[in-house]
Amino acid sequence: MALLQEKKHEIINAYQVHETDTGSADVQVAMLTERISKLSEHLKTNKKDHSSRRGLLKMIGQRKRLLTYIMKKDQAHYRELIKRLGIRG
């Protein structure tokens, strides 16, 4: 499930570290979180779509790796980010 260009710009503007930042770990995690939520909704109605389920698991793994990187770099920033995104209970 691809994101619309307007939604991408909205996410980038919300999570960017500086003016030209489009690929920092924060932005990537926010984009993946949005894609994961969209794909989860898709899979609720299309239970037999196994290829999308595999893609979802790959995205979750990628997000987990990025969050681990952020956590190792700065614990306080990590806690703020997951709170802002509303993930991890």
Curated annotation (Swiss-Prot):
GO CC, alphabetical: cytosolic small ribosomal subunit
Biological process (GO), any one: translation
Subunit-level organization: Part of the 30S ribosomal subunit. Forms a bridge to the 50S subunit in the 70S ribosome, contacting the 23S rRNA.
A Pfam family per the record: Ribosomal_S15
Segments passing through the bilayer: none
Keyword field contains Cytoplasm: no
Family: Belongs to the universal ribosomal protein uS15 family.
InterPro entries: Ribosomal_uS15, Ribosomal_uS15_bac-type, uS15_NS1_RNA-bd_sf
Function (record text): One of the primary rRNA binding proteins, it binds directly to 16S rRNA where it helps nucleate assembly of the platform of the 30S subunit by binding and bridging several RNA helices of the 16S rRNA. Forms an intersubunit bridge (bridge B4) with the 23S rRNA of the 50S subunit in the ribosome.
GO molecular function, one term: rRNA binding
Gene: rpsO
Keywords per UniProt: Ribonucleoprotein, Ribosomal protein, RNA-binding, rRNA-binding
Matches recorded under HAMAP family: Ribosomal_uS15_B
Protein's UniProt name: Small ribosomal subunit protein uS15
Keyword flag rRNA-binding: yes
SMART domains: Ribosomal_S15
Superkingdom per UniProt: Bacteria
